[in-house]
Amino acid sequence: MAHRETNGSKLFITVLCMVAACSAVPINDLLDRASQRSDMLHSLSTTLTKDLSNHVPPVGWTMMPRPPLCHTSSLQTPNDKEQALQLSESDLMSLARSLLQAWQDPLVDLSNSANSLLHPSQSSISNKIRELQEHSKSLGDGLDILSGKMGPAAQAISSLPYRGSNDIGEDNISKLTNFHFLLSCFRRDSHKIDSFLKVLRCRAAKVQPEMC
């Protein structure tokens, strides 16, 4: 028992040291790191979506839900960069964190479903989904620290309920179709997150808006 408590204490101290170290890093550097991570997230989700697109049968495309049915669609977000540039830093951070948090459970469903997906690249897809989860967790931790530096408004998170399930389809076509749809929604949102963080990075570096 004492050994377990010692290990637990060491882990707690390690986490505290990591948080303290990150808290001492200038906000510009933290935004650079977050922007790099969000870029990786969007790039990986884009690659995954393309991999799946080649194997969705014609009937699958007719069955696929439209983007407005993504579970995050109720969140009011800028439609383009010009609109994003009109928002405050706190609003942009709040939107990015809300979108990222809304994907915690859906990414678990994607990971579980990837293990039984009938696809030539099933193993690769499964590994990449796990990478998405790791990058999302890492980015989320970073944004928690950043929002803490920016104040209460940046820490506000909008609730975006996800009503999915572990089983995203009864047969291979419906599973592949729903898997692709869910991943497409994530790709769309990862692009938004990446765009918001790039605007924040530009502002922190005092770069002209048109250069963002």
UniProtKB/Swiss-Prot annotation:
Q: Where the protein is mainly located, per its record?
A: secreted
Q: Which InterPro entries match?
A: 4_helix_cytokine-like_core, Somatotropin/Prolactin, Somatotropin_CS
* Keyword entries, A-Z: Disulfide bond, Hormone, Secreted, Signal
* Bilayer-spanning residue ranges: none
* Pfam families, per database record: Hormone_1
Which residues belong to the signal peptide in this entry? 1-24
GO BP field: positive regulation of cell population proliferation; positive regulation of receptor signaling pathway via JAK-STAT; response to nutrient levels
What GO molecular function annotation could you give as one example from this UniProt entry? hormone activity
Family that this chain belongs to: Belongs to the somatotropin/prolactin family.
Protein's recorded name: Prolactin
